[in-house]
């Protein structure tokens, strides 16, 4: 419900987990969605997810809820978001963008985004994604890198 952008499809324990960013529209028609699983309507411009056994059957999708509120809920500017759920060394991490860079520049300019990463709690057997909080600090380093060896840019969060 309320699809806007930032779609991603993952597979967990044989089920399809579809994550997406919700729209700016009001939620007055929330009751018309029958497969909402007792969940409240998502907040405006938040990240939500749905689960299905058969992704090609539109009636098979079950709404599971919001897993990240709008960045404005965490002290950043209100705006749309894109996330990526990544499993690494047995843990899940949520990558997202925020306006932290824009705010720190204090130039009045807009549209500058920076990437953030926080740990996510995911139960693969039930396809439950816990609520994730965006932060300015992110996560601690997962392991140390050798400063005398060439390091690829994608290791910057390890």
Positions of the model-derived regions?
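Carbohydrate-active catalytic/glycan-binding domains of CAZyme proteins
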Residues: 1-158
């Amino acid at each position: 419900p309320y699809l806007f952008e930032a779609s991603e499809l993952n597979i967990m324990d044989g089920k399809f987990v579809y994550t997406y960013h919700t729209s700016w529209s009001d939620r007055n028609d929330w009751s018309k969605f029958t497969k909402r699983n007792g969940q409240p309507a998502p907040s405006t411009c938040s990240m939500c997810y749905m689960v299905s056994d058969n992704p090609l059957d539109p009636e098979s999708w079950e709404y599971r809820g919001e897993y990240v509120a709008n960045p404005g809920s965490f002290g950043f500017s209100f705006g749309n978001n894109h996330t990526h759920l990544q499993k690494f060394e047995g843990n899940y991490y949520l990558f997202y963008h925020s306006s932290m860079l824009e705010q720190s520049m204090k130039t009045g300019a807009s549209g500058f985004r920076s990437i953030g990463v926080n740990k996510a709690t995911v139960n693969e057997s039930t396809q439950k994604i816990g609520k994730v909080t965006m932060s300015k600090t992110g996560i601690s380093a997962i392991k140390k890198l050798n400063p005398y060896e060439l390091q690829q840019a994608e290791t910057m969060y390890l």
